[in-house]
Amino acid sequence: MFRWGIIFLVIALIAAALGFGGLAGTAAWAAKIVFVVGIILFLISLFTGRRGR
């Protein structure tokens, strides 16, 4: 999940450096969404893992 976030971040940085504003904004938005989903899934797995023990 974090791998996809990093990939979208790199795409956004490259697009921003080359001047493609719309593509950079879209890739940055996708990276934020993937990052937030990854954090939420991490927290869920952290709490459910502790309850099982």
Swiss-Prot record:
Q: Where are the transmembrane segments?
A: 4-24, 27-47
UniProt keyword annotation of DNA-binding present: no
- What Pfam family is a match for this entry? DUF1328
**InterPro entries per UniProt:** DUF1328
Query: Can you name this protein?
Result: UPF0391 membrane protein SG0393
Task: Answer whether the UniProt record assigns the keyword ATP-binding to this protein.
Answer: no
Keywords attached to this Swiss-Prot or TrEMBL record, sorted alphabetically, are: Cell membrane, Membrane, Transmembrane, Transmembrane helix
Q: Main localization of the protein?
A: membrane
Q: How does it sit in the membrane?
A: Multi-pass membrane protein
* Family in the record: Belongs to the UPF0391 family.
User: Which residue positions does the secretion signal occupy?
Assistant: none
> Which HAMAP family would you find in this protein's record?
UPF0391
An annotated GO cellular component of this protein is: plasma membrane
Q: Where in the cell is it found?
A: Cell membrane
